[in-house]
Amino acid sequence: MSRRHSAEKREVIPDAKYGDIILTKFMNSIMYDGKKSIAEAIVYGAFDIIEQKSHNEPLSVFKQALDNVAPSIEVRSRRVGGATYQVPVEVRSERRQALAIRWIITAARGRNDKTMIDRLSAELLDAANNRGNAVKKREDTHRMAEANRAFSHYRW
């Protein structure tokens, strides 16, 4: 990896229906093989189910789910004198968002519902209510950081 220039961030175009940039990033993460129309159909279908089940604005449920899943602290490996320590560090806001999106999608794909639309809507509703595998992943990450708090002075 070149140290000369850091890659410049590309501008993300907001999605057509809700006009939200974070939702576009979410769709792009769901997308396989560049098939964005399928990813959009999955997300919008899941949002329709969320609206039916919760009687709330689906975008606010989505934002609440992201907030509940996003980690504030994580551990990173640091090698000091032959020993590798798991050092707790704060998570940057961009990485928090990316991790939350990734964990929600992974948890949704791991569910046993019939279609991805059902799985995604169920996982988003669970995450918005502080339940589900994505929230469990965040709690595990925080627990690891808490357990390794003694090594926090090795921060970089």
UniProtKB/Swiss-Prot annotation:
- Listed InterPro entries: Ribosomal_uS7, Ribosomal_uS7_bac/org-type, Ribosomal_uS7_CS, Ribosomal_uS7_dom, Ribosomal_uS7_dom_sf
Alphabetically sorted, this entry's keywords are: Ribonucleoprotein, Ribosomal protein, RNA-binding, rRNA-binding, tRNA-binding
Q: What cellular-component terms does GO give this entry?
A: small ribosomal subunit
Tree of life domain: Bacteria
GO MF, any single term:
structural constituent of ribosome
By sequence similarity, the record places it as follows: Belongs to the universal ribosomal protein uS7 family.
Protein name as catalogued: Small ribosomal subunit protein uS7
Task: Give the species.
Answer: Beijerinckia indica subsp. indica (strain ATCC 9039 / DSM 1715 / NCIMB 8712)
Q: Which gene encodes it?
A: rpsG
